[in-house]
Amino acid sequence: MNNLVGATPEETAFFKSFIDRHSVFLTAGFSEIAVSENTKLEPEESLVTSVLGSQKKASIERSTYAGFRYALNLLLKSLLTNVAVTNHKHSPDFKLRGVIEGFYGTPWTHEQRLRGLAHFSDFGFNRYLLAPKDDPWHRYDWRSALSEDFLNRVSELIAEGRKNGVTVAVAISPGLTVEYSDAHDVSAIMVRFKQLHSIGVREFGLFLDDIPARLQSEKDSAKFDSIMQAHSYYCNAVWAELKKLDSDNSLAICPLQYHGKATEEYITEFGNALDPDLALIWTGREICSEYLDVSDAKVFKAKTNHIPLYWDNYPVNDVAMLHELHVGPIEGREKGLHNHSLGYFANPMDRFELSLISLSTIGDYLWDTQGYDAQVSWEYSLTLLMDNSGDRAAIRNLLRGCFESCLRVNPAPDFYAMLEEASFSWKTGKPAQAAQIVETHSKQMLNDVATINSAQFSQPHWREESLKWLTKYEAVGKALQEIAGILSTCGVSKNSNLSGTKADLVTITSIRASLNSDPTRIFGSGLDMTLAELADEIRWSLTS
């Protein structure tokens, strides 16, 4: 099974590691995969055919190793979805498709980063940018040389990235303490960039985000008329040295103002003062943007003289979003945005394992903006990341209650549908039916909790990372049992309104207070609003 014909030694070696990670190739793989060269294809392109049925066969045409690597993703999808492809041209929309470890909070471990590179490649990404906000080397100790241990770890990341077709980039953020007019501070950051260059890094980041918006040094105040002027001077000076070091180097700048309409004074002046060869990072209208669209990208280009390099703050859930769990699919990113963007980096959560769910959907969008379907992509991400169907069904129910985010989508589609059905039943004089609806959902939720908490659950890391939300999920499940009990004993007045007791009101009030005392966000605000309506109706019956 999985006889690879015509592949290079490098491709053959990678294929062995790929099928070890994806068991479907071992249980239901292809009898033969024929690999051939097609020099007319772009580096990341491939032509892929998969024949399913009793005699599974496949073929890959590619011009480079990268084309072969990404073609495997399509064959994997063909097996997992049982959908054959015929001479399919597999080609990405966005040329730069990246993950940036740029969140506040506990940085990922080295082991997670190494595993992440394989996952990112499975999702179609080709960049990983190391820029953890709370790791001292990134923002606080930037004037000191990087340690040998750190450089060794980055070297390991580069090697693993190369195997997976993912380029590793590194960013430094000196803005908290830098003196922009001091040539020594240009030299200081170049010490690090030279160290990184010596181990193979060619893509760098210079970040000036989340720093004081005024000049802090007397020398800087004397030399520059504005913070923008200081920033552009310093960035251009560093870039001149980086180019001198190696013409293959590139540098991405994250500006002080990294979101807005792109018509603001700082970003327009900064962009126009910046060397046009520098990439300029932008997060959209907001720090965490509900949407990214073509029209805003065009404005950015017109005003700053730079094509935006998007840093999308999703699924990150740091700072004010700590009580949310961002596990939904990416939405609100316009089709065709790649035609007006230098590239796209997704900023994940510190919860490495659960970040992979949304990152998988982002990879799908970046590869094919026209064909991207958020819900289809999300369901596939679960199938890709969790083999056990029973475990997958249980965790799916939990995760579908955690869609609340800056994307402003339905925070809990299935739960809201249940609430709507139950409230319609009691409002139309059928409280017993409403009780049954709520009771059925409650039982399912508590069964989900039992499955996820079992010793046999196949993804214990998912359980650990979602523990806060799982705990509240269980609390809601138990609360629904009490609500079902109330509804089952409610009467119906002659005008079809519910009639209940003062004890019912006390119970509902207690449930709301208990659930609201836990700030963990799950199911949005729908349950609390529904319980408020139920209490109001019972209260009205007691006073009428």
Where would I find each of the regions flagged by the language model?
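Short acidic low-complexity segments
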Residues: S23-N38
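Feature activates predominantly on carbohydrate-active enzymes
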Residues: N2-F14, F18-R21, S46-K194, S198-R202, ...
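Short, conserved phosphate-binding/catalytic loop or strand-edge motifs used
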Residues: D135-W137, L208-S217
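Catalytic-core regions of glycoside hydrolase
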Residues: G102-F103, Y140, R202, R214-V376
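Short, internal active-site loops enriched in acidic
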Residues: T39, G175-L176, I211-P212, L256-K261
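C-terminal functional modules
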Residues: G371-S544
